[in-house]
């Protein structure tokens, strides 16, 4: 579960390395976000020469969480880190590559471009 002020690793090659959550989108007074939810964040660390610079305000979708997610078949999946992918307004990723596995729940929430770029979908 991701909330305001949570720091996440960035799982793409957009130029950002770490982001800090400003707001969870999707409802009035919503406090937490899980896999597949969109957040507004600021870039805390960035690589030189990247598309995204430090201190930029961006939108991102969460692809991995330590808290995990329950599935309809009764299974439960957790990851070792909290990670997100920076997206544009039309839900397409800013970068051209995705690093690490992503959850299958992104397919249900219409992030098909992220699912197709990911090396592994769990």
From Swiss-Prot:
Protein function: Binds to 23S rRNA. Forms part of two intersubunit bridges in the 70S ribosome.
Single GO MF descriptor: large ribosomal subunit rRNA binding
SMART domains: Ribosomal_L14
Annotated HAMAP family: Ribosomal_uL14
Domain of life: Bacteria
Alphabetic keyword roster: Ribonucleoprotein, Ribosomal protein, RNA-binding, rRNA-binding
Protein name per the record: Large ribosomal subunit protein uL14
UniProt-listed CDD domains: Ribosomal_uL14
InterPro entries: Ribosomal_uL14, Ribosomal_uL14_bac-type, Ribosomal_uL14_CS, Ribosomal_uL14_sf
Upper lineage: Bacteria, Bacillati, Bacillota, Bacilli, Lactobacillales
Any one cellular-component term (Gene Ontology): cytosolic large ribosomal subunit
Record-annotated membrane-spanning stretches: none
Keyword Transport on entry: no
Subunit text: Part of the 50S ribosomal subunit. Forms a cluster with proteins L3 and L19. In the 70S ribosome, L14 and L19 interact and together make contacts with the 16S rRNA in bridges B5 and B8.
Family: Belongs to the universal ribosomal protein uL14 family.
One biological process term in Gene Ontology: translation
Recorded coiled-coil stretches: none
Signal peptide residues on this chain, from the entry's feature table: none
Designated gene of the protein: rplN
Source species of the chain: Lactiplantibacillus plantarum (strain ATCC BAA-793 / NCIMB 8826 / WCFS1) (Lactobacillus plantarum)
